[in-house]
C-alpha cells in the first residue's frame, strides 16, 4: 500500500468521508476547504492523514443542529503546511479516547523522517497542522 499520496488525492478522500458523515449528521456537521491549487498539486501527505484529523474532530466533539461542528481544512503554498481545525464542543465522555489517532499520525511522520504535528487549542478552537511532503523526500 502507498505510504504517501498527492495532496489532491488525500483531500478527495477526506471530502468523500465528510460527505458521508454529513449524511449521518445532517446540519450538525459543516466543513470548508481552502487549500491552494499549488499545494494540492505539488506535495504529498501520509495516506488518510487529513481524514484521520477530520475523524478525530467528529469523535471528540458534540454535534447538534443548534451547535454544529465546523471542520476547516486550509493550507497555503508559502507555509508548506495544511491545518485541520474545528470549533471545540467537547463530548462529556469519549469512547476509546486514548489519543491513538494523533500518536499514530505523529509516528508515521517520524518514520518518514519529517517533523510531527503542531497541535493547538485556544479561543474555542482545536487545530492540528501537518507538513506537506515535497519531492526532496526520497520516497515521494
Located regions from the model:
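Two-component histidine phosphotransfer core
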Residues: 1-131
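C-terminal end segment of the histidine kinase catalytic
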Residues: 135-140
Amino acid at each position: 500500500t502507498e505510504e504517501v499520496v498527492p495532496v489532491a488525492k488525500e483531500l478527495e478522500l477526506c471530502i468523500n468521508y465528510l460527505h458521508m458523515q454529513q449524511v449521518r449528521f445532517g446540519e450538525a456537521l459543516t466543513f470548508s476547504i481552502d487549500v491552494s491549487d499549488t499545494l494540492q498539486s505539488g506535495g504529498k501527505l501520509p495516506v488518510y492523514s487529513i481524514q484521520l484529523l477530520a475523524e478525530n474532530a467528529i469523535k471528540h466533539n458534540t454535534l447538534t443542529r443548534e451547535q454544529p461542528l465546523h471542520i476547516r481544512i486550509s493550507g497555503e503554498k508559502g507555509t508548506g503546511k495544511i491545518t485541520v481545525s474545528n470549533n471545540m464542543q467537547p463530548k462529556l465522555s469519549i469512547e476509546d479516547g486514548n489519543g491513538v489517532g494523533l500518536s499514530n499520525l505523529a509516528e508515521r511522520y517520524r518514520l518518514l523522517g519529517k517533523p510531527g504535528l503542531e497541535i493547538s487549542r485556544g479561543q474555542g478552537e482545536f487545530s492540528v497542522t501537518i507538513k506537506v511532503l515535497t519531492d526532496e523526500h526520497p520516497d515521494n
